Curated annotation (Swiss-Prot):
It comes from Caenorhabditis elegans. One of its GO terms (biological process) is cellular response to oxidative stress. Residues 1-74 form a transit peptide. InterPro entries: Kinase-like_dom_sf (IPR011009), MitoQC_Scaffold_Kinases (IPR051511), PINK1_STKc (IPR040110), Prot_kinase_dom (IPR000719). The gene is pink-1. This is Serine/threonine-protein kinase pink-1, mitochondrial. Autophosphorylated. The active site is at 338 (proton acceptor). One of its GO terms (cellular component) is cytoplasm.
């Protein structure tokens, strides 16, 4: 048989396959499984939908003109490859046989990442766009007035009371599930009809056009607003606002300059701040001012301490939040300079709930990345109230080359506010003069105040700013005193052997044995675990306290923790026989057994270092103190034995 006959036979067979391929059972059975994309395009689209005339030439021409698949014979291969690569689970197909190298990540760094970068524990990570025109807001009742602004409640325009009250401002501890917590039923307060507060800044220069003078005179109010730099556009030179939001700094949603809105009570309350004031000979074509839109808070600290029963545990949480705010401001070289109880705002839903605290009113703030202020004449403003100025500020005398340092001014003011929280009276309002008082003249705190809080407050009010405790160290000490751990936190630390590891040297953790630091990591693991588990039991630990713990854990470091532990175990008499590292390790290991039934075999094979004494600095015996009247401030026990 010649090759010509073979060619004719193959040609006829091919024609029959093309003509009847769409109806062949074998194609219908295997093509969808092997090449689903090819089958859908080639069989369903081409063979079924296209009419097939008998003329082969016309049939081929129609296929070419309609689909062009003759010019792309391998297009199905590309389609299959694209489908395979887009599968979400293909990377996990060989996961059991993959071996990842262990990452050497420091435990403290991991804890900071968990509580600093997770939306669950840090609602400030969530951002919301807010309108920048005053017509987009509806004003409510008058809330208060100062020398430079009036504050009104507000909500977004064209929104009813229900939608405004349920406006969502961020995730976090407010979204804790109640299923596992088994929270007892409580009466909920009515939703706020006006959840915002708008600060209407007073413009006393309506005869000037433009926005530059408004930004220069009112820009300090934007210190806690992360987007302030974009609004100011370099008008304030060295002004450096806070780079991010913080749970204990007032939440500014947005700020903008717009036309002056004359409210019904404006003429009665602040006539001099209106463009209708009698001394203006001419005014700008469009009177403007700055508006600062903030979250609305329930009460000031001054109102709270006089309307609520004193609770020393609640007071300690409030003071710790205040110190967290001071720590954040100190870190970014921002001084609020007017730290008084009227400028501390609180938010809570129920009367017996521990409030969340924020520092507000930054109109007198110093935010130029420098603590020093040239004080050459009395015309230079040092900000704030005379009764709440730190001693180094109150005693400053103007002169040539005189500089005033505000680094520790807010920290000192926090000490006076701590007195007000615990006793309802700030000693510097009437009893003492900030410029002349002596530390021995400070009034005694109630005996039921926790000993750590008592010592921290006295150290905050040191006259010499160089001897004053840093805000982060003070905040650490109070935060550690608030951890429950199923017992008094001091007893827990004694079991851990921490009392034998504190030294007189600040920052001694750098030279501590690696093994001892690893045991400190175990303790921090327990504290972190308790904080995470508290998320499942919100009826035991308040929302404010959970947020406080997350803030503390998101910024902690070992060096500051060791320095803070001196408030629990102050340095005392030197050891006659210095403890070895093995003694510390055994003591620390004993702590683990008190929290886990499975820890009996924990590091039984751990061998002490041969040069253990050389790896540990000189250890000092510590004086163990207890609270007066035996009160440790524990309210609830997370774990009962």
């Amino acid at each position: 048989m010649s090759m010509k006959r073979f060619g004719k036979a193959a040609y006829r067979i091919a024609n029959e396959l093309v003509a009847k391929g769409g109806r062949l059972p074998i194609f219908q059975r295997f093509l969808p499984r092997i090449f689903p994309a090819t089958y859908n395009l080639g069989v369903h689209v081409v063979l079924k939908k296209a009419p097939f005339p008998r003329q082969n030439a016309l049939r081929i021409a129609r296929l070419v003109t309609r689909h062009g698949r003759v010019f792309r014979p391998f297009s199905s291969v590309i389609i299959e490859r694209h489908r395979f690569q887009n599968q979400n689970d293909w990377r996990r197909k060989f996961q059991p046989i993959r071996k990842e190298l262990p990452r050497n990540v420091d435990l403290v760094e991991r804890i900071r990442q968990i509580f600093g970068n997770s939306l669950r524990y840090n609602e400030d990570l969530k951002s919301t766009e807010w309108p920048n025109r005053i017509d987009s807001y509806e004003f409510g009742e008058f809330l208060g007035q100062g020398c430079n602004a009036a504050v009104y409640s507000a909500r977004l325009a064209n929104s009813d009371a229900e939608s405004s009250g349920n406006t969502h401002y961020g995730a976090g501890f407010n979204e804790v599930t109640n299923i596992l917590a088994e929270i007892p039923p409580v009466s909920k307060v009515a939703q706020k009809k006006f959840p915002l507060a708008i600060k209407l800044m007073f413009n006393f220069e309506h005869d000037r056009d433009g926005d530059a003078h408004l930004l220069k005179s009112m820009g300090n109010e934007l210190a806690p607003y992360p987007n302030a730099a974009k609004l100011l556009n370099g008008q304030m030179g060295t002004f450096r606002p806070l780079p991010a939001k913080h749970p204990n700094v007032v939440r500014i949603q947005t700020a903008f300059i717009d036309s002056l809105k004359v409210l019904p009570d404006a003429i009665e309350r602040y006539p001099d701040a209106l463009h209708t004031a009698r001394w203006y000979e001419s005014i700008a074509s469009e009177p403007k001012t700055m508006y600062v839109v903030m979250r609305r808070y329930r009460q000031t600290l001054h109102e709270y301490v006089w309307t609520r029963h004193r609770n020393y545990w609640t007071g300690r949480v409030i003071i710790a939040q205040l110190l967290e705010a001071c720590t954040y401001l100190h870190k970014h070289k921002v001084a609020q300079r007017d730290m008084k109880s009227d400028n501390i705002l609180l938010e809570y839903d129920f009367d017996d709930e521990i409030p969340q605290l924020v520092v507000a009113d930054f109109g007198c703030a110093l935010a130029c990345d420098n603590w020093q202020v040239d004080y050459e004449s009395d015309e230079v403003s040092l900000g704030g109230n005379a009764k709440t100025k730190a001693p180094e500020i109150a005693t400053a005398v103007p002169g040539k080359n005189v500089k005033v340092n505000f680094e520790m001014a807010d920290t000192w003011a926090a000490g006076g506010l701590s007195y007000e929280v615990l006793t309802r009276s700030n000693p510097f309002y009437k009893l003492l003069d900030t410029a002349t008082y002596q530390e021995s003249e400070l009034p005694a705190l109630p005996s039921r105040v926790n000993f750590v809080a008592r010592d921290v407050i006295f150290d905050l009010l040191k006259r010499d700013p160089n001897e004053r405790v840093k805000p982060n160290i003070a905040a650490n000490a109070l935060n550690l005193s608030l951890f429950r751990m199923g017992e008094d936190v001091k007893q827990m630390m004694e079991k851990c052997g921490i009392s034998q590891m504190t030294t007189l040297l600040a920052g001694s953790s750098k030279v501590l044995s690696q093994k001892i630091n690893s045991r400190l990591d175990k303790v921090m693991n327990l504290i972190t675990a308790e904080t995470i588990m508290a998320n499942l039991a919100p009826h035991l630990i308040s929302r404010a306290e959970r947020q406080l713990r997350a803030t503390f854990l998101s910024r902690m470091n070992r060096e500051d923790i060791w320095r803070s532990l001196q408030y629990f175990f102050p340095a005392g008499v030197q050891l006659d026989t210095p403890a070895t590292s093995s003694d510390c390790l055994e003591t620390i290991s004993s702590l683990m057994s008190s929290f886990s039934n499975d820890s009996e075999n924990y590091e039984k094979q751990q061998k002490p270092a041969k040069n253990g004494y050389n790896n540990v600095p000189l250890l000092l015996r510590n004086v163990i103190r207890t609270d007066a009247d035996g009160i440790n401030g524990i309210v609830h026990r997370v774990r009962s034995k």
